[in-house]
Regions:
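Short amphipathic alpha-helix that is part of the acyltransferase structural core
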Residues: 1-25
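Conserved beta-hairpin
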Residues: 15, 28-45
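A short catalytic or substrate-binding loop motif that flags glycine-/basic-rich loops and adjacent residues
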Residues: 23-27, 149-151
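Extracellular structured ligand-interaction cores
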Residues: 28-30, 116, 154-156
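A conserved mid-domain beta-alpha-beta active-site/ligand-binding segment of alpha/beta enzyme cores
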Residues: 146-169
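Short, cationic low-complexity segments
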Residues: 169-203
Length: 203
């Protein structure tokens, strides 16, 4: 297996067909997992929608380093493919970066892929309702306060990508306690979606 950069457009069919959210996030970086020259998975990273989130992790001074691992889609979720894709795509990101990601409890996700790749666990968000902008749109685009959308609890993970000095500095600046990993049964979901995969001509 090999992880390579791909165009963000190549990730779109995977996100819309294979990911449960069915919504396009902000994409700054996209990478593909190739097995025998066939694209079998994608991962994307983008700027978080919440500026307060970016400022809150390590402070305003480091908010520009924050990036969210916002989509991870695999063709068949074969053993170790998800952790391999996460670990090796992070290596391709510029340094330093503060990588955040979430495991949605409503989807039965615990975040074992993040635990396997040495992310730090920083707690769980509370269930809440937000203003809704309609299906497939982020709540930041909402304008009608009477239209509400349920937000499930999510496990929050963070990873510091950089050299030893940068990683130590960022971890010291972390404004959250590092907590023991959550445990529980992970549910597998099948979106039923299909994507046409492109063969890699040259490796």
């Amino acid at each position: 297996m090999i992880v390579l950069p791909i165009k963000s457009e190549e990730a779109v069919p995977w996100i819309m067909q294979k990911h449960y959210a069915k919504r396009l996030p902000s994409i700054s970086y996209a990478f593909g997992l190739y097995k025998e020259k066939k694209l079998v998975g994608i991962i994307t990273y983008g700027i978080p929608a919440s500026n307060s989130l970016c400022e809150g992790i390590c402070g305003k001074e480091y908010k520009e380093f924050v990036i969210e691992l916002n989509r991870l889609c695999l063709l068949d979720n074969a053993k170790n493919q998800s952790s391999y894709l996460v670990a090796n795509s992070i290596k391709l990101l510029p340094k330093p970066k503060i990588v955040v990601s979430y495991a949605d409890t409503a989807q039965g996700h615990v975040g074992y892929v993040y635990q396997a790749t040495n992310f730090l666990f920083r707690g769980t968000t509370k269930e809440r309702t937000d203003m809704s902008a309609g299906e497939g749109k982020h709540s930041r685009h909402a304008t009608d306060p009477s239209i509400r959308q349920f937000r499930s609890a999510k496990h929050r993970y963070v990873y510091f990508h950089g050299n030893k000095t940068e990683k130590k500095l960022l971890q010291r600046k972390l404004n959250y306690d590092v907590l023991p990993y959550p445990k529980g049964e992970t549910k597998q979901y099948n979106s039923g979606g299909k994507v046409e995969t492109q063969a890699l001509l040259f490796v």
